[in-house]
Amino acid sequence: MDNQTTISDLISTFYNPLTRHIMKPYLILFTVLSLLFYSEQSEAQTPAPPQSEIIALTGGTIHTVTNGVIENGVIVFEDGVITHIGSNVRLPSDAMQIDVTGKYIYPGLIDAYNHIGIFEIGAVNMTIDINEQGPVNPNAKVERAFNPESRHIGVARSAGILTSVTTPGGGLISGQSAAMMMDGWNWEEMTLKSGTALIVNWPTPDDDYAENVQKLRDTFGDARSYKKAKDAMDRGESNRHNQDTRWEAMIPVFEGSMPVMVNANEVRQIQDALTWAEEEDIELIILGGSDSHLVADHLSNKNIPVILTEVLTSPNRNWEEYDARYGLPGKLFQAGVQFAIAGSPSAANVNRLPHEAGASAAYGLSKDAALRAVTISPAAILGIDDRVGSLEVGKDATLLITSGNPIEYATQIEQVFIQGRESDMMDSHKMFYEKYREKVEQARRD
């Protein structure tokens, strides 16, 4: 099938005006899937092979994020891991040297909350795998549904986003998020860390608010009872214990090895979530946090981190200042709250993350703090800072070569490495740009 098939061609396939015959639904489905498949193949980027030789980037300005800036620096990586970094590094004799003089080297950006890999086309339900059936799905591991062929992955890479914390949605307990690398052949290869957080959607304050909060309490109570029964069996105090995959998945939460990320924006939601988490004795992360500045002192005192979503947007309420959302990161920073900046959850808008951080830098947050909010801060909050988020010896060679600060609009991401693999920089946006630039060139020649 020609990947340039037009809408009119598609309609004529569905409906033949001569025979007045409408194609059966299952044939329509097959045709749509075929078009999506061939279109995707035309835009597919081949995943990079594992790093096979030592690579040394020389002459660039290295922004480590955690240990300052190194002018005329050298960074060496082998088998996907940084082995040397500094201004006076003795290069291995067999290293492939890449001169990046005049360029800048940054750690790959991290989007701490989005639906990339589980959302493709909003109008095509079969390409959306965000929500599971039913309200309680703690056992849903998002990486199992991750689509490594998503065209949004290449767009994310081109924007400097090399790690995506893909997050399920819907229901009361949505499932578990996962940190995914933006290159690889399959979900197993792309998973940096599974189970970065258990996702809870705090009930919306409405007529059923108290009832829904109680449902959440009861759910955690059932899961805790399950763990107690299992522990009793392990100690030999009980002979029978029926396994439940939902409650089994929540055991790491009670053992303190998995945080709970609560989607809460309004001040009442945040306050009640804080009280609930303290009662449950669990590690809490606030997601969304539109009103988090109103309880910033409490968040700071309790060391509760916040992942802010959609900084680059309008205020929540008509009476709020026009820059209420732009200035929110700066307010949290001044209050001493640990926070990260995430963009829109929509996979189609994931490339806006650098602009979200850039907007905060224009409204009260320093550029260094804004950069940290999309690198080391989300890495630390989600427990992946031993691998990504900064440029240090022993961490993954997941980095950017750029023309400037990646949160600046004018900056170009010239090349990326993910665990030492030199990734393809083509994406669907660039393909369309080249296509329509050719149209302009043809018009000029005419």
How would you label these PLM feature ranges?
Residues 60-63, 392-436:
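C-terminal cap of metal-dependent C-N hydrolases
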Residues 47-49, 53, 62, 66-106:
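Histidine-rich, glycine-flanked metal-binding segment
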Residues 42-44:
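Boundary at the C-terminal end of the N-terminal hydrophobic targeting segment
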Residues 121-122, 127-131, 139, 259, ...:
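His/Asp/Glu-enriched, well-ordered alpha-helical/loop segment
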Residues 152, 157-285, 412, 418:
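Polyanionic/metal-chelating signatures
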Residues 26-35:
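Sec-dependent N-terminal signal peptides
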